[in-house]
């Protein structure tokens, strides 16, 4: 009889500016059983982004065709662009016993939980809204209007935090990374299957 780890879907959500992308990047470095789910998007590539590595970039029409063909695990419109998670790619990774890390919002969490098992959801909170605003200003990539929008959006997203399995406050990057990794390791221990030969 062979015991085997069943692949998990691990979802990391947080308001913009909470350090979620950096946390995801570090988790992938320290855990070789994790793979990042690559989203399909209609937004324009940013400087340095590569098609098939950061995102799969598609036109509106291509995206809508994929929706019609039921190719997404979940999809949502965020600001003015569409984002979706390709079903086949995720299935392939899970089948290999790999865990798939998602960087999506509460809407995505709801639809994935509806359609899939073995989902672990983690919400990353800033220490406070004041600190979040400070972080957004320090990035110096957004104008006043965008910062206002992001702060409103952050308050809205935080109101859904209680729907998540875990909530972690990112007041110290190293400690937060450690906490999230411990959650993943513990969840793996609850999730295995065995095959009789």
Swiss-Prot record:
Keywords of this entry: ATP-binding, Cytoplasm, Kinase, Nucleotide-binding, Transferase
Molecular-function GO terms, alphabetical: ATP binding; guanylate kinase activity
Enzyme Commission number: 2.7.4.8
Family: Belongs to the guanylate kinase family.
PROSITE patterns (UniProt xref): GUANYLATE_KINASE_1, GUANYLATE_KINASE_2
Domain of life (superkingdom): Bacteria
UniProt binding sites for ATP: 14-21
GO cellular component: cytosol
Subcellular location: Cytoplasm
Organism this protein belongs to: Rickettsia typhi (strain ATCC VR-144 / Wilmington)
Designated name of the protein: Guanylate kinase
CDD domains registered for this protein in UniProt: GMPK (cd00071)
InterPro entries recorded: GK/Ca_channel_bsu (IPR008145), Guanylate_kin-like_dom (IPR008144), Guanylate_kinase (IPR017665), Guanylate_kinase_CS (IPR020590), P-loop_NTPase (IPR027417)
Pfam families in alphabetical order: Guanylate_kin
Function: Essential for recycling GMP and indirectly, cGMP.
